[in-house]
């Protein structure tokens, strides 16, 4: 609890009665502690304050740097752009675009392009 800065009102409180942010941190701490080869993270920073978001991002980067695979599912485009080495955009249940890291860091209008694909725009080339 200390590592992920979980702050319950008291130590007797049940996890289900914690704030959404503290629940989120406990779930992620539990999964990271298991040192998985693959981590599926759905909205890992939902409900967290700025400091906790930064900490979670650093933990995900550590896992990535250890060679772990992370499937990050998020509605936060900046989060995806900052943490991903490849982005797949899903629209109507199908992958409408797959964008490699080189394009993520080099395209100045990448947010707009991803937004078009999220809305069902044309496929990304290369």
Give the predicted meaning of each segment:
Residues 1-126:
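Glycine-rich phosphate-binding loops of nucleotide-dependent enzymes
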């Amino acid at each position: 609890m200390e590592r992920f800065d979980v702050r319950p009102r008291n130590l007797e409180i049940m996890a289900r009665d914690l704030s959404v942010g503290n629940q989120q941190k406990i779930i992620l701490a539990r999964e990271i502690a298991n040192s998985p080869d693959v981590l599926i993270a759905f909205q890992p920073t939902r409900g967290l304050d700025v400091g906790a978001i930064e900490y979670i991002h650093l933990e995900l980067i550590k896992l990535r740097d250890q060679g772990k695979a992370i499937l990050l599912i998020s509605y936060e485009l900046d989060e995806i752009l900052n943490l991903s080495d490849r982005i797949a955009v899903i629209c109507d249940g199908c992958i409408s675009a797959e964008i490699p890291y080189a394009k993520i860091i080099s395209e100045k209008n990448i947010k707009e392009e991803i937004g078009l694909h999220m809305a069902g725009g044309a496929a990304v080339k290369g």
